[in-house]
């Protein structure tokens, strides 16, 4: 419960709802585990494929899109990134001939990111090692019921935060 008290200025300030020891343990385990997992996945992808997790995710989303292309705004939403950060990542992928940008023919204003044949080849080459790293460092450590709980919990977190971030 939040405790409310007045400051000397007369302004009312709410006391923070501090985490219980159990809540703090869960939060820290999540933060530490997530950081270590993403570091391990990034390391594997960079070592084996010269890709980051963010770049891999871009290639995956483009590979799943009709005509292997998406508007930059849709792609930014899909990878949960700012448009400026995505533009930087797309430039790096363009330099490696994995992605190309085109003007959207529908309105002539939007920009499409399109996965090239080289990008698809690199994704297909990177995928087996990446999936193995995901299995080894995450999936295989959990029982099916735990995976369901994680999917439910983070689906809910994503949905709630998504309602307010946009």
Task: Put a short name on every predicted segment.
Residues 31, 60-67, 127, 155:
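Short, locally clustered residues in the helix-turn-helix/winged-helix DNA-binding domain
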Residues 72, 90-91:
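Short, hydrophobic-biased segments on the C-terminal half of alpha helices
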Residues 22, 54-56, 146:
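N-terminal positioning helix adjacent to the helix-turn-helix/winged-helix DNA-binding module
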């Amino acid at each position: 419960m939040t405790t409310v008290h007045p400051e000397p200025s007369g302004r009312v300030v709410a006391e923070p709802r501090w985490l219980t020891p159990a809540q703090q343990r869960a939060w820290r385990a999540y933060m530490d585990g997530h950081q270590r997992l993403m570091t391990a996945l990034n390391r594997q992808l960079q070592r084996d494929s010269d890709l980051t997790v963010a770049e891999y995710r871009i290639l995956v989303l483009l590979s799943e899109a009709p005509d292997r292309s998406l508007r930059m705004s849709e792609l930014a939403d899909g990878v949960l990134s700012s448009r400026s950060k995505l533009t930087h990542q797309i430039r790096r992928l363009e330099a490696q001939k994995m992605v190309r940008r085109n003007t959207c023919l529908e309105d002539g204003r939007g920009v499409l990111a399109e996965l090239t044949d080289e990008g698809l080849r690199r994704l297909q080459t990177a995928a087996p090692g990446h999936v193995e790293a995901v299995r080894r460092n995450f999936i295989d450590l959990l029982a099916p019921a735990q995976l369901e709980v994680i999917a439910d919990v983070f689906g809910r977190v994503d949905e709630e935060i998504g309602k307010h971030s946009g």
